[in-house]
Amino acid sequence: MSAEPELIELRELAPSGRIGPGRTRLERANALRIAPGTTRNPSQQHVPGRGHRFQPAGPTTHTWCDLCGDFIWGVVRKGLQCAHCKFTCHYRCRALVCLDCCGPRDLGWDSALERDTNVDEAVERETPDLSQAETEQKIKDYNGQINSNLFMSLNKDGSYTGFIKVQLKLVRPVSVPSSKKPPSLQDARRGTGRSTAVKRRTSFYLPKDAIKHLHVLSRTRAREVIEALLRKFMVVDDPRKFALFERTERHGQVYLRKLSDDEQPLKLRLLAGPSEKALSFVLKENDSGEVNWDAFSMPELHNFLRILQREEEEHLRQILQKYSRCRQKIQEALHACPLG
C-alpha cells in the first residue's frame, strides 16, 4: 500500500445508496487467494480448496457464509468452520469451497498486548452532549495536537467534519464481484460502488495491514462507516457480517468494545483526542454470537422460522428412530431369552 493515506469522503447516505437486507443472492465463481504484491500465474496447476480442516461451528456462531453469502441459521447444525483459517460456510457449501486455506493469520498486532486483551460487551458508551462553545474548543484543542493536515472543521449548523482511521483486521475472506482478473487494492481504489446486477462473486483475503482514512460528519453512524468501507473495496458480503470496534490501550492491556450501529465514531474521536492509544477504530468480523433480529426483513425472518421448523422435525425424527431401534433390540433380546 502507498504511504499516502487514501481518503474516503463519506457525507450523507441517500436512501437508495443504503444496503438493504434483501439483496440478490450471488453465485460463487472461482475463488482465489490474492497475496499482496504478487500475481497468479495462469499456467500453474492449482488444486482448489486445499488445507482446510472443517469442523462443526460452535452453538453461538451466528454469521454469514463465506461462500454463498447467506446467513447461517440453525440450532443443531450451525455450519462448518475451518480450524485453521476460520473460513465459515454452510454444510451444503463445503464441497464448493475453492479458496485454499491460508492457515492461522498473523495480523501483526502486539502479541504481548493481545494476550491480555479484554473484549467488552457491545454496550453503547455514554457520551456527553457538548455545547457549541465546548465543541468549538474541543476542535481547536484537537487540531493543535495533530501533526498532519487531517483537521476537524466546525460547520455553521453546529455539526463538524473530520477524519477517522480504520484498520481492517479481518481473519476470514471477503467476496467481490467476479471479473476476468482478481481485484487488487489498486483496482478497489479506482473502482466505484457495488453493482446490483452482479451474478457471480470471487473470494480473497484482504492484506493484514489495510488501513483507510474516512472523511465523515459528526452524525455519521458506525453502520454507515462499515458500508462505506465495503463499497470502497467492492465487497459484496452483507454489512452485518462485520462490526466496528474501538480499541484502547490502558495499563499495558488492550480493550476492544464493539460499537453499536448508531454510535458516531467522529464524536468518539473528538472526545478521546488524536492519540491512537487512547482510541483507534478496527473493522472485524461480527462474531460476538449476538443477532440483531430487527435488522432482518420480514421474508428473511419467515424463512428462518421455516428452517427452524424443518430442523426441529428432522431432529425429532432422528430421536424417535433412535428409541425405536433401542426398543426393537430389547424386544429381540427378550424373545431370545429362554423361558423359566
Swiss-Prot record:
One of its GO terms (cellular component) is nucleus. One of its GO terms (molecular function) is zinc ion binding. Coiled coil: none annotated. Residues 194-288 form the Ras-associating domain. A zinc finger (Phorbol-ester/DAG-type) spans 51-101. GO terms for biological process: DNA damage response; positive regulation of protein ubiquitination; protein stabilization; Ras protein signal transduction; regulation of cell cycle; regulation of cell cycle G1/S phase transition. Residues 175-196 are annotated as: Disordered. Residues 175-185 have a biased composition (Low complexity). Residues 290-337 form the SARAH domain. The modification Phosphoserine is found at residue 2. Potential tumor suppressor. Required for death receptor-dependent apoptosis. Mediates activation of Mediates activation of STK3/MST2 and STK4/MST1 during Fas-induced apoptosis by preventing their dephosphorylation. When associated with MOAP1, promotes BAX conformational change and translocation to mitochondrial membranes in response to TNF and TNFSF10 stimulation. Isoform A interacts with CDC20, an activator of the anaphase-promoting complex, APC, resulting in the inhibition of APC activity and mitotic progression. Interacts with MAP1S and XPA. Binds to the N-terminal of CDC20 during prometaphase. Binds to STK3/MST2 and STK4/MST1. Recruited to the TNFRSF1A and TNFRSF10A complexes in response to their respective cognate ligand, after internalization. Can self-associate. Part of a complex with MDM2, DAXX, RASSF1 and USP7. This is Ras association domain-containing protein 1. It comes from Mus musculus (Mouse).
